[in-house]
Design a protein with these regions (language model features):
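SAM-dependent nucleic-acid methyltransferase catalytic core
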Residues: 1-35, 180, 200
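Short active-site oxyanion
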Residues: 5-7, 78-82, 183
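Conserved phosphate-coordination/catalytic loops
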Residues: 8-11, 55-66, 160-168
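Glycine/Thr-rich phosphate-binding loops of Rossmann-like dinucleotide-binding domains
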Residues: 17, 38, 92
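Glycine-rich helix-loop-beta junction characteristic of Rossmann-like nucleotide cofactor-binding loops
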Residues: 19-21, 74-75, 173-179
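SAM-dependent methyltransferase catalytic-core segment centered on the flexible catalytic loop
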Residues: 21-81
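Class I S-adenosyl-L-methionine
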Residues: 30, 34, 38-49, 84, ...
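Conserved Class I SAM-dependent methyltransferase catalytic core
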Residues: 58-115
Length: 228
């Protein structure tokens, strides 16, 4: 099986993860398509006007999310990082079950202020949350080089995808935890904002999305290859 970096693959993230050897990735991003908050709010017009684009995307069960996290744990190097996007609902209810039986530790969190309000019965959602996970052993020296990143980050984005993410924040996190030409992994890439962040920082993107993407994963004879 051969896979190339800096390609927007249209594929199941599990298929891509199974191609990656153990302990090879320094930094990954994971933005699961969960529906916990939608089930909680239970809007009657879900899938019509409100959030139609989001509702049309394939939803991940909790078991699927746990499966992704365990595979990401397997491929991450010791003291490597995984950046996990969550909303307020999952932040409050906790992600302990997601990282159970892995070597991931919660070491930090960044609040992304999107600059516009979303849904909510009481307070309106304006933020998303990026949980910073580090694989054991936990350490900052030599693993995190940018100490100027604030824990509340304001960045407006042009919405090209229901889950558009802040490229400038991702760029700072990528450069803080990797070196030029290192591989950055995103197995549920959505609008491929991590791809853009990698290209702009001189890193190699390895990722896919089940719906979006330009190229299918192809089986070929040969060893796993990660090349631009």
């Amino acid at each position: 099986m051969i896979v190339r970096t800096n390609v927007k693959y249209c594929a199941n993230g599990f298929d891509l993860l199974l191609m990656i050897p153990d302990n090879t990735i320094k930094t990954s991003f994971f933005d699961p398509q969960y529906r916990g908050v939608l089930d909680k709010l239970n809007y009657g017009n879900e899938g019509k006007r409100r959030g139609k684009q989001r509702c049309d995307l394939p939803q991940m069960s909790e078991e699927t999310i746990i499966g992704f996290v365990r595979e990401l744990n397997r491929v991450t190097v010791k003291s490597g990082h995984m950046f996990l996007w969550v909303d307020k609902f999952h932040l409050c209810t906790g992600i302990d079950k997601w990282i159970e039986n892995t070597d991931f530790n919660i070491v930090d969190m960044i609040v992304w202020d999107k600059g516009k309000m979303g849904m909510g019965y009481r307070s309106r959602r304006r933020s998303e949350y990026l949980i910073v996970l580090q694989k054991s052993p936990v350490r900052a020296k030599g693993c995190w080089t940018d100490h100027g990143i604030p824990d509340v980050w304001f960045e407006k984005v042009v919405k090209k995808h229901p889950h558009s993410k802040p490229v400038e924040l991702q760029k700072r996190l990528i450069t803080a935890t990797t070196e030029p030409n290192d591989v950055v992994l995103d197995p549920a890439a959505g609008g491929f904002s991590v791809y853009d962040s990698c290209i702009e920082t001189g890193r190699l993107f390895l990722g896919c999305d089940l719906v979006f993407g330009d190229e299918k994963l192809k089986e070929k004879s040969g060893d796993f290859l990660c090349a631009a």
